[in-house]
A protein has these predicted regions:
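Non-catalytic DNA-binding core/recognition domains of DNA-processing enzymes
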Residues: 13-95, 255-258, 282
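Residues within the helices of the helix-turn-helix
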Residues: 22, 163, 275
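Flexible interdomain linker/hinge and immediately adjacent N-terminus
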Residues: 85-133
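A short, glycine-centered helix-capping/turn motif at helix boundaries
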Residues: 145, 150-173, 267-271, 281-282
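Active-site/catalytic core of tyrosine-dependent DNA strand-transfer enzymes
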Residues: 203-260, 265
């Protein structure tokens, strides 16, 4: 780890001791990349406080969701109210879109229907079955692409956040700490709201479970999904794989969750259904309501 990354990590831990590990890593990565992209030669943490105006100008081109996270990281690190004020403006803008049930420009440009999502899944399933029956053409990368679409599209199970599956293990796991698959069930200890909801489990439908079991026999690693260097997948890697699976569209996990909930809650069903699905997707009922778009 570089000296700057180490200092960022320690300072954020000091300022937010209860911040989850995933959020900590995200904040450090964002802050380090802003510093790198702006080509600063000043490697002191004070740089983030001394150059507020220039940094705000640099990051303003990000989409609202990314900008909100970036500003949150900057505020947690520095405590500068300028970052917080802009962050609150962005959050208000995002919430207004949700209230009006409108899509952002990026979402509108890349939005696809639930039926189109299912078409992609079934095309992926057909290709995976073909690879299994013809071992000579088997590609681990393509099979991982199929599994990711199955896990995250909503065509098979309610779609959780990408890193819930990036952390998913199939062997040598600690059942009290790790996310893991066992005997047709998914167990989640690591996810964004784990401190609130604790361990969550999800049953895997039998047909998809069969595909998982066949994959585990071929998988040489401890993780359900892995990169070309046999390490667990990162969020950016998962995003790139999804973009490929959906024909080059900018389809993120967040958008797939929006598409799924927009379909499920099209006519706003009973709150009990909202509560149940929110739990299965690893977030709060309030956030589920915010996701609804038409």
């Amino acid at each position: 780890m570089s000296s700057l990354k180490q200092e960022l990590t320690e300072k954020i831990k000091e300022n937010r001791p209860k911040l989850g590990l995933s959020s900590l890593k995200t904040y450090v990565s964002i802050l380090f990349n802003v510093h790198k992209a702006m080509e600063s030669e000043d490697n002191k943490l004070e740089w983030y406080s001394d150059n507020v105006k220039d940094i705000l100008e640099f990051v303003k081109g990000k989409n609202n969701q990314s900008l909100k996270t970036c500003l949150s990281a900057l505020f947690v690190l520095t405590g500068k109210q300028e970052y917080r004020e802009v962050m609150m403006q962005v959050m208000q803008s995002v919430n207004e879109l949700y209230k009006q049930q409108k899509k952002s420009p990026t979402q509108a440009e890349n939005w696809i229907s639930e039926a189109e999502v299912k078409d992609v899944y079934f095309a992926q399933l057909e290709n995976a079955l073909h690879m299994l029956s013809t071992k000579k053409i088997f590609s681990a990368n393509k099979y991982i692409e199929f599994l990711l679409v199955g896990f995250l599209s909503g065509a098979v199970i309610p779609p959780r956040r990408s890193m819930d599956y990036g952390e998913l293990m199939i062997r040598n796991y600690d059942p009290k700490v790790d996310n893991y698959y066992k005997a047709g069930k998914l167990y989640f200890n690591k996810y964004k709201t784990a401190k609130t909801y604790g361990l969550q489990t999800l049953d895997v439908p039998a047909p998809f479970n069969l595909m998982i079991k066949r994959w585990i026999k071929l998988n040489p690693t401890d993780y359900m999904l892995f990169s070309t260097n046999k390490q667990k997948l990162s969020s950016p890697q998962i995003s790139r794989i999804l973009n490929t699976a959906f024909g080059g569209k900018n389809i993120s996990t967040n958008m797939l969750r929006h598409i799924y909930l927009s379909s499920v809650y099209a006519n706003i069903p009973a709150l009990s259904s909202i509560d149940r699905l929110a739990t299965e997707m690893g977030h709060s009922p309030a956030q589920a309501m915010e996701y609804i778009k038409h």
